[in-house]
Amino acid sequence: DKQMIKEKDAFESEDFREMAARLEYLKEIRGIGVFTASPGMGKTFALRCFAKGLNPNLYQCAYLCLSTVSVQEFYRQLCEALGLESGFGKSQMFKSIQERLYYLYKEKKQPFICILDEAQYLNSNILRDLKMLMNQKYDSVNCFSLILCGEPYLNHILEKQVNEALRQRIVVHYNFHGLTDQEVSD
């Protein structure tokens, strides 16, 4: 059962190491990272290992995998992850989320890391709003890290013209290649 695999028992394939290194880099610089692979290749496990290794005194992390939701529901999930009230309209939740993200970054010195798994199912309105959430202080600072993880189809979604502004903000992008011949023989 893959759920029972402990982080300490991880087989560190080339893909695992590449993703781990890129996640560490993204953690430091903040911004958007995209990770794609076919099902069962270890993306979610690598995310779990990364999240488990975060110092909770230095980072606040949320893992969201219910990606087939409306924009309103997405905002509710994000509010809940940030410890905010979610009973308001979209514009109030958006404002509250941006204020909390800035507070965590600037005042608390505990930047937020948002992991969105199964991101290939996010609708285009959520993708557009993610770009707007990244706008802080007239784009002069990235207050948080956004990790979009999904199947290879996510790359095609991000290549669409409508997602150009979001795509331009991606600072880390990695596509899993699968086990090497050497890794298979080991």
What does each model-found stretch correspond to?
Residues A51-L54, L154-R169:
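Short regulatory helix/loop adjacent to the ATP-binding pocket of P-loop NTPases
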Residues Y59, V69-F88:
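Conserved NTP-binding/hydrolysis module of P-loop NTPases
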Residues R22-Y25, S91-E107:
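Conserved alpha-helical scaffold flanking the Walker A/P-loop in AAA+ ATPase domains
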Residues I29-C49:
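Walker A/P-loop nucleotide-binding motif
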Residues D1-R30:
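A short, basic N-terminal segment
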Residues I32, Y102, K109-L148, Q161:
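Conserved Walker B catalytic segment
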Residues P56-L66:
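Conserved catalytic segments around the Walker B and adjacent sensor/switch elements
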Residues L64-S67, L158, V171-E183:
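Conserved AAA+ ATPase "SRH/arginine-finger" region at the nucleotide-binding site
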